[in-house]
């Protein structure tokens, strides 16, 4: 009983924070407008790469974490894409390696911010994939208990929070400051090769 009440309390807090951030984003966009440092195409490319960790997260824990209207929204918006992604897991693997060598390592000439965001999206994808695979390797009895539910909830919240924050920073044309993940992404793009002048 207390777990259900605590879950609803956490959901209300997350929704309040989300609404507050949404209002702040709308105010900031209306005040400043979008910065011209990144083009719309570059931003869309970054948004597309942040979809990869979302698909991976939804594959591992989406239906188990979501319920009610969120599950209906999930089925209408991402459900078919997640089914294709989970049916052919080699697609995510191929996208990961192709984008790493083409964009992050500098075969294609793109701006450093784009390389940073693509690298960060790939790192979040890799972490989500590893943690999700480890959780799926646990016995079913553990996953059905409170420990498994808590682990899936934490994976979902951390992945979605990171992706939402990073997408907000892409929208503003800025770099993110996620602990450890941003530092690893900076290390990947600091060599200066493949940078668009």
Swiss-Prot record:
Its main location: plastid. It is a multi-pass membrane protein. It is found in: Plastid, Chloroplast membrane. Pfam families: TIC20. InterPro entries: Tic20. The chain crosses the membrane at residues 3-23, 47-66, 81-101, 118-138, 141-161. Keywords: Chloroplast, Membrane, Plastid, Transmembrane, Transmembrane helix. GO terms for cellular component: chloroplast membrane. Belongs to the Tic20 family. This is Tic20 family protein Ycf60. It comes from Cyanidioschyzon merolae (strain NIES-3377 / 10D) (Unicellular red alga).
């Amino acid at each position: 009983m207390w777990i259900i009440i605590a879950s609803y309390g956490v959901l209300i807090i997350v929704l309040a924070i989300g609404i507050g951030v949404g209002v702040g984003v709308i105010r900031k966009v209306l005040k400043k407008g979008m910065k011209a440092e990144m083009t719309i195409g570059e931003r869309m490319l970054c948004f597309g790469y942040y979809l990869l960790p979302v698909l991976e997260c939804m594959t591992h824990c989406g239906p188990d974490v979501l319920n009610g209207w969120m599950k209906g929204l999930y089925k209408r918006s991402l459900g078919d894409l997640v089914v294709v992604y989970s049916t052919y897991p080699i697609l995510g693997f191929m996208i990961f390696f192709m984008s790493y060598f083409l964009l992050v390592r500098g075969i294609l000439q793109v701006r450093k911010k784009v390389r940073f965001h693509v690298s960060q999206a790939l790192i979040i994808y890799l972490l989500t994939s590893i943690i999700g695979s480890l959780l799926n390797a646990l016995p079913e009895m553990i996953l059905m208990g409170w420990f498994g539910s808590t682990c899936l909830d934490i994976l979902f919240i951390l992945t979605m929070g990171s992706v939402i924050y990073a997408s907000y920073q892409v929208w503003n044309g800025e770099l993110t400051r996620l602990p450890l993940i941003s530092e690893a992404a900076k290390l990947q793009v600091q060599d200066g090769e493949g940078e668009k002048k």
